[in-house]
Amino acid sequence: MKLDFSLFVHMERTDGSRSHAQLYEEFVQLCQMADQGGMRAIWTGEHHGMNFTIAPNPFLNLADLARRTKNVRLGTGTIIAPFWHPIKLAGEAAMTDIITDGRLEIGIARGAYSYEYERLRPGMDAWEAGQRMRETVPTLRKLWKGDYAHEGEFHKFPATTSSPQPVQDNGPPLWIAARDINSHEFAIEQGCNVQVTPLWNGDAEIDSLMEKFNEAKKTKGQGKDPKIMLLHHGYVTTDEEDANEAAKTLSKFYCCLLYTSPSPRDQRGSRMPSSA
């Protein structure tokens, strides 16, 4: 099995000491280091109204990075499908594929934070978000192929062809954020790759996610060769004390984020599992 390394990065503002402009310049510099260092890809996500993940539209960031990098692939990690109309998503992705000269890859998810659901699509729960994502994913390649009419639960539109068309044959590679076995099976059945993020349980959770992926390959992967990508947090330093302090600071910030945004299930707030 071939193992590649990529950079998953977004802007974070844990205090007011630096402006958003400064944070973006640091983001770009880190991405340039990844490109020069031979990493396979750079991934950046979509989130709204939160300083923990400042990325209102990853396509904008990737279009800018296309002019500042040379070789690295450029991916969305991830687009929150329920916040997009399929025609708009297909068109913006295709334009970004042109701007990046065919380096684009698209990660798609249902979303993780009830905080965003409540503000961008009030009343939507995690189940509906997952169903919206499952409806959106198959439409993308059909819109890129052209003359596609859609009659779904959440979207309806007459025959449409995405304009522009992507550079890559059949469009950019698609990746689905998955946790439970059903989301792994959905991704592979659709001819997509899989993104997984272990949250709380260390190596045991990684083993569990890999087991689900391998099982889904057996049942849904005939004639397909899906890849799996693991997001793992890291911190680069030469100073152990600095590493420990950074871990404490970020853990505190992350925990505050998870437990202060209201959730339909718990008014203290919680992060919903990022299964499809």
Question: Which residues does each predicted region cover?
Answer:
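N-terminal beta1-alpha1-beta2 module of alpha/beta enzyme domains
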Residues: 1-74, 169-172
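Flexible, glycine-rich active-site loops centered on histidine and acidic residues
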Residues: 2-22, 82-150, 194-195, 200-204, ...
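Hydrophobic faces of well-ordered beta-strands that scaffold small-molecule active sites
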Residues: 5-7, 42-44, 74-76, 104-108, ...
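Acidic (Asp/Glu)-rich catalytic clusters
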Residues: 64-70, 97-101, 188-189, 219-221
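Aromatic-lined glycan-binding groove of carbohydrate-active enzymes
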Residues: 186-188, 225-229, 234-258
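Conserved small/polar residues in nucleotide/adenosyl-binding loops
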Residues: 259-266
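Hydrophobic alpha-helical segments, chiefly the membrane-spanning helices
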Residues: 270-276
